[in-house]
């Protein structure tokens, strides 16, 4: 995304590796990206993601900022982070209960190794996809009431 009206903070650059300068030079207009994303999301019957509620809030805020309706709010969705707390059983720092697993932690639990390029959008999508299908295959998750409801 090309920054328009904001600057990418250095802390964010350290996480995902995209500097403000790189985004200015190589980024795409956010309206174009949102239009493509919303068309794809509109053609799907289920949104799947890791920490999906965060992503839906960020995209929803951008939709509203651009003058669009936030139709993602009511879209059926499945979060691999929220649904695998008991599966991963990673102790919470407070000592009570379990914490939400990071995508890398879930991936390691399922496949015994890390995936590369953490915080790279394409790598995160691929890892989430792989985790979702492995969890479904194992019967660990049931994203809908019936597998017949899945569109794939």
Residues covered by each model-derived region:
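Short alpha-helix plus adjacent loop in nuclease-associated cores
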Residues: 77-98
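Residues on a specific face of well-ordered alpha-helices
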Residues: 82, 101-105, 130
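Active-site metal-coordination segments of metallo-dependent hydrolases
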Residues: 96, 117-122
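Short, well-ordered alpha-helical segments in soluble proteins
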Residues: 63-67, 84, 88-91, 110-115, ...
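Acidic two-metal-ion nuclease catalytic site recognized across multiple nuclease folds
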Residues: 106-110, 122, 126-152
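Ser/Thr-centric signal marking residues that sit
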Residues: 13, 80, 84, 128
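Acidic active-site catalytic centers that drive phospho-/nucleotidyl reactions
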Residues: 55, 79, 124
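Conserved non-catalytic scaffold segment of RNase H-like nuclease domains
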Residues: 1-66, 71-73, 101-113, 119
């Amino acid at each position: 995304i090309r920054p328009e009206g904001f600057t990418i903070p250095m802390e964010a650059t350290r996480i995902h590796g995209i500097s403000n300068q790189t985004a200015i030079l190589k980024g795409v207009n956010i309206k174009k990206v949102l239009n493509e994303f919303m068309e794809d999301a509109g053609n799907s019957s289920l949104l799947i993601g890791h920490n999906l509620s965060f992503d839906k809030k960020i995209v929803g805020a951008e939709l509203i900022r651009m003058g669009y309706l936030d139709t993602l709010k009511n879209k059926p969705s499945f979060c691999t982070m929220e649904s695998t707390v008991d599966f991963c059983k990673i102790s919470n720092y407070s000592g009570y209960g379990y914490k939400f697993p990071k995508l890398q932690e879930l991936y390691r639990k399922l496949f015994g190794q890390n995936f590369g390029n953490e915080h790279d959008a394409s790598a995160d999508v691929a890892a989430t996809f792989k985790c979702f299908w492995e969890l479904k295959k194992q019967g660990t998750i049931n994203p809908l009431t019936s597998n017949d409801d899945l569109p794939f």
